A protein has these predicted regions:
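Two-component histidine phosphotransfer core
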Residues: 1-131
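C-terminal end segment of the histidine kinase catalytic
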Residues: 135-140
Length: 140
C-alpha cells in the first residue's frame, strides 16, 4: 500500500468521508476547504492523514443542529503546511479516547523522517497542522 499520496488525492478522500458523515449528521456537521491549487498539486501527505484529523474532530466533539461542528481544512503554498481545525464542543465522555489517532499520525511522520504535528487549542478552537511532503523526500 502507498505510504504517501498527492495532496489532491488525500483531500478527495477526506471530502468523500465528510460527505458521508454529513449524511449521518445532517446540519450538525459543516466543513470548508481552502487549500491552494499549488499545494494540492505539488506535495504529498501520509495516506488518510487529513481524514484521520477530520475523524478525530467528529469523535471528540458534540454535534447538534443548534451547535454544529465546523471542520476547516486550509493550507497555503508559502507555509508548506495544511491545518485541520474545528470549533471545540467537547463530548462529556469519549469512547476509546486514548489519543491513538494523533500518536499514530505523529509516528508515521517520524518514520518518514519529517517533523510531527503542531497541535493547538485556544479561543474555542482545536487545530492540528501537518507538513506537506515535497519531492526532496526520497520516497515521494
Amino acid at each position: 500500500t502507498e505510504e504517501v499520496v498527492p495532496v489532491a488525492k488525500e483531500l478527495e478522500l477526506c471530502i468523500n468521508y465528510l460527505h458521508m458523515q454529513q449524511v449521518r449528521f445532517g446540519e450538525a456537521l459543516t466543513f470548508s476547504i481552502d487549500v491552494s491549487d499549488t499545494l494540492q498539486s505539488g506535495g504529498k501527505l501520509p495516506v488518510y492523514s487529513i481524514q484521520l484529523l477530520a475523524e478525530n474532530a467528529i469523535k471528540h466533539n458534540t454535534l447538534t443542529r443548534e451547535q454544529p461542528l465546523h471542520i476547516r481544512i486550509s493550507g497555503e503554498k508559502g507555509t508548506g503546511k495544511i491545518t485541520v481545525s474545528n470549533n471545540m464542543q467537547p463530548k462529556l465522555s469519549i469512547e476509546d479516547g486514548n489519543g491513538v489517532g494523533l500518536s499514530n499520525l505523529a509516528e508515521r511522520y517520524r518514520l518518514l523522517g519529517k517533523p510531527g504535528l503542531e497541535i493547538s487549542r485556544g479561543q474555542g478552537e482545536f487545530s492540528v497542522t501537518i507538513k506537506v511532503l515535497t519531492d526532496e523526500h526520497p520516497d515521494n
